[in-house]
C-alpha cells in the first residue's frame, strides 16, 4: 500500500467490493503470448496497441453517443492496431486472437483474495465495460465466476466508464451508497472516475505508473489485489 494512504482507522470497512475485470482480475496482455506466436517480435506491441485502442474507442463512442458493444469494439481495435503495425492479420488469425480474449489469464493472487473476502462475509461483484456474454465466458474460464455476484456490465446503460451512468450500476444493484462500496481497478483513470462518483477506491498500480493529474486521487493505491484485504 502507498505511503500516503489514508489510515485504516479513518475508513469504515466497506460493505461490498466491486472489481473492474479487464486488467484488474484478468491480464489483458496475456493475449501477447498468442500474438507473439503469430507475429514473432511484434506480439507485445500488438497486445499493448490493441488495449490502448480498445480504451480509446470506448471513450469515443460514449462521448459521441454512438454505443457499440464491447466485443465489437475489441474486434475493431484489433483490426486497426494490426493494420497500424503493418501486420498481416487474416480472418482466421483475428478469430484466434479474439478467442484468446475470451480466455484471458487471471492474476495468480485473485482466487485467494476473493476467498478471503468471502470468508469475511463481504459481498463481491464486478463492474465492467465487458458485454454480459464476454464476462460470463471469461470469468468461467478464469475459475472465478462462482465467487462473484453481481456481475454488472455497462451494456445495460450503453455508456462506458467513466460515464456516471456506468458507475451508478453498483449502488443500484447492491442497495448501498457508493461510499459504502470499495471499487477496485488497475486502471488509474477508472479508479479516479469511480472516486468522482463517490466510491471508496483502490488503484492497483501493478506497473508502478505515475498518478494521473486531475485534482483528485483514489482513496488508496496498492500494487497487488492482496491490498484489498487491508480495508477489512
Predicted feature descriptions by range:
Residues 2-15, 115-118, 127, 131-132, ...:
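Asp-based, Mg2+/Mn2+-dependent phosphohydrolase catalytic module
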Residues 31, 46, 93, 144-147:
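Hydrophobic side chains within well-formed alpha-helices
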Residues 39-43, 84-89, 143-147, 175-176:
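Short helix-capping segments at alpha-helix termini
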Residues 6-55:
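Active-site neighborhood of HAD-like aspartate-dependent phosphohydrolases
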Residues 33-34, 49, 76-80, 96, ...:
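Alpha-helical elements of Rossmann-like donor-binding domains used by nucleotide-donor carbohydrate transfer enzymes
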Residues 44, 58-95:
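A metal-dependent, Asp-based hydrolase signature
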Amino acid at each position: 500500500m502507498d505511503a500516503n494512504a489514508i489510515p485504516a482507522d479513518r475508513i469504515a470497512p466497506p460493505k461490498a467490493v466491486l472489481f473492474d475485470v479487464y486488467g484488474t482480475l484478468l491480464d489483458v496482455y496475456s493475449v501477447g503470448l498468442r500474438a507473439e506466436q503469430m507475429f514473432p517480435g511484434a506480439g507485445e506491441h500488438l497486445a499493448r496497441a490493441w488495449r490502448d485502442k480498445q480504451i480509446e474507442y470506448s471513450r469515443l463512442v460514449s462521448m459521441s453517443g454512438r454505443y457499440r458493444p464491447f466485443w465489437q469494439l475489441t474486434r475493431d481495435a484489433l483490426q486497426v492496431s494490426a493494420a497500424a503495425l503493418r501486420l498481416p492479420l487474416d480472418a482466421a488469425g483475428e478469430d484466434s486472437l479474439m478467442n484468446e480474449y475470451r480466455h484471458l489469464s487471471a492474476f495468480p493472487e485473485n482466487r485467494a483474495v476473493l476467498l478471503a473476502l468471502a470468508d469475511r462475509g463481504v459481498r463481491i461483484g464486478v463492474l465492467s465495460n465487458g458485454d454480459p456474454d464476454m464476462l460470463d465466458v471469461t470469468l468461467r474460464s478464469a475459475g472465478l465466476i462462482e465467487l462473484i455476484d453481481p456481475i454488472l456490465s455497462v451494456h445495460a446503460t450503453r455508456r462506458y466508464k467513466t460515464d456516471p451512468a456506468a458507475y451508478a450500476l453498483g449502488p443500484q444493484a447492491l442497495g448501498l451508497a457508493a461510499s459504502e462500496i470499495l471499487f477496485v481497478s488497475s486502471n488509474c483513470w477508472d479508479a479516479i472516475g469511480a472516486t468522482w462518483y463517490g466510491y471508496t477506491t483502490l488503484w492497483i498500480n501493478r506497473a508502478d505508473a505515475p498518478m494521473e493529474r486531475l485534482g483528485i486521487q483514489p482513496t488508496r493505491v496498492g500494487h497487488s489485489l492482496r491490498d484489498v484485504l487491508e480495508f477489512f
